[in-house]
Amino acid sequence: MEAIKVHIGKTVALMNDNIDTDQIIPKSFLKRIERTGFGEFLFDSWRYLPNRKPNPDFPLNAPDRQEATILITGDNFGCGSSREHAAWALLDYRFRVIIAGSYSDIFYMNCTKNGVLPIVLPREAREKLAKITAEEKVTIDLPKQQVISSVGTYPFEIDATWKNKFINGLDDIAITFEHIDAIKAYEQKVDSI
């Protein structure tokens, strides 16, 4: 997992509430287990017209928002069925940070396990962030737990374990390997019994 200590990026806002995992990545695109190749299908039914041409009215298709790495969105983001592919699609598209009012518990965990930092901020803060220009950048300072922008600085909470994983770029496998000597010692002990 790629570490996030301080992330500086451009934003795009999709302020709908209750965006479910089927809207994030439709089930028709879940026919493989690789973690890449899903970005082109992110928000597919909204991003594309029936003829598969980009919908010019969809925020992610705006020419001046193509470099966005921070998604600002509504409440209850990632609700619906559990699918890790939703986090994969967001990351593959290039989003490193999602700022929402709340998340489905399973979706939140899928994001943290796959290197997408889910931040919770109140609606007032998100509405201000949603109005910044496409040229402006927002700073996510994870050690200080702050979202820093031209419209304000907003503190956020994150579990200390997840914070450590993001700052050090540790996924579950990397954490397991941190304890490899103890694992090997245990296996030798069990094998000798």
Curated annotation (Swiss-Prot):
Which keywords, in A-to-Z order, does the entry hold? Amino-acid biosynthesis, Branched-chain amino acid biosynthesis, Leucine biosynthesis, Lyase
EC number assigned by the record: 4.2.1.33
How is this protein annotated for GO cellular component?
3-isopropylmalate dehydratase complex
Q: Kindly report, in one word, the top-level EC class recorded for this enzyme.
A: lyase
GO MF term list: 3-isopropylmalate dehydratase activity
Q: Which domain of life is it from?
A: Bacteria
Any Pfam family hit: Aconitase_C
Pathway(s) this gene product operates in, as recorded in its UniProt entry: Amino-acid biosynthesis; L-leucine biosynthesis; L-leucine from 3-methyl-2-oxobutanoate: step 2/4
What Gene Ontology biological process does one annotation of this record name? L-leucine biosynthetic process
Which Gene3D superfamilies does this chain map to?
Aconitase, domain 4
User: Entry's InterPro entries?
Assistant: 3-IsopropMal_deHydase_ssu (IPR004431), Aconitase/3IPM_dehydase_swvl (IPR015928), AconitaseA/IPMdHydase_ssu_swvl (IPR000573), IPMI_Swivel (IPR033940), LeuD (IPR050075)
Q: Which SUPFAM superfamilies match?
A: LeuD/IlvD-like (SSF52016)
Family, similarity comment: Belongs to the LeuD family. LeuD type 1 subfamily.
Q: Note the HAMAP family from the entry.
A: LeuD_type1 (MF_01031)
PANTHER family listed in its UniProt record: 3-ISOPROPYLMALATE DEHYDRATASE SMALL SUBUNIT (PTHR43345:SF5), 3-ISOPROPYLMALATE DEHYDRATASE SMALL SUBUNIT 2-RELATED-RELATED (PTHR43345)
Q: What is this protein called?
A: 3-isopropylmalate dehydratase small subunit
**Species the sequence originates in:** Listeria innocua serovar 6a (strain ATCC BAA-680 / CLIP 11262)
